[in-house]
């Protein structure tokens, strides 16, 4: 919060209750982080990536899909995705019967769907702010699966606990 504005300085009380005095000329030449939006929105952003081994990405066998249907969060996804892919592959005619031409369900896509559904059902993830799970550009450490969401508590220690719980 800005506590004082003078001709040559602006005094700000930081989120940790420390006070910073900024020369007014610095307001033009440098950038500053304003935490007020976070406080007023009621959500604190989580933006982290899990790096997955690209060599582990593969198609799921029907028996694996059946086993994954026991996960409540995946049941609807698998049913919908199987119908979508069956329709797509049927549109290819005889070519759709060849595995090389057909679209199939992967462990990566299924994991991404699970993570997204897990976050949407997590009681400490803010329901009214952006939530997405996406793949980023692959690199030497693997294929990053980015988790982007907001907690429903902005207090630092609580936020860190929620973030740790999600990634544990």
Residues of each region from the PLM?
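Soluble accessory domains appended to multi-pass membrane transport proteins
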Residues: 1-95
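Short, conserved charged micro-motifs
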Residues: 59-62, 155-159
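Intrinsically disordered, low-complexity acidic Ser/Thr-rich regulatory segments
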Residues: 93-116
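Short, hydrophobic beta-strand segments
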Residues: 95-101, 142-155
């Amino acid at each position: 919060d800005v506590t004082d504005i003078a001709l040559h300085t602006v005094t700000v009380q930081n989120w940790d209750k420390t006070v910073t005095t900024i020369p007014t000329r610095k307001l033009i030449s440098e950038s500053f982080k304003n935490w007020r939006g976070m406080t007023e929105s009621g959500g604190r952003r989580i933006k982290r990536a899990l790096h997955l081994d690209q060599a582990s990405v593969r198609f799921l066998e029907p028996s694996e899909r059946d086993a994954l249907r026991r996960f409540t969060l995946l049941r609807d996804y698998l049913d919908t995705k199987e119908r979508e892919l069956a329709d797509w592959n049927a549109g290819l005619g005889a070519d759709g019967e060849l595995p090389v031409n057909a679209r199939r369900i992967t462990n990566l896509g299924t994991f991404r769907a699970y993570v997204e559904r897990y976050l949407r059902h997590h009681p400490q993830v803010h329901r009214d702010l952006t939530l997405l799970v996406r793949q980023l550009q692959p690199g030497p450490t693997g294929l990053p699966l980015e988790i982007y969401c907001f907690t429903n508590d902005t207090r630092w220690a609580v936020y860190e606990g929620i973030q740790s719980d999600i990634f544990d």
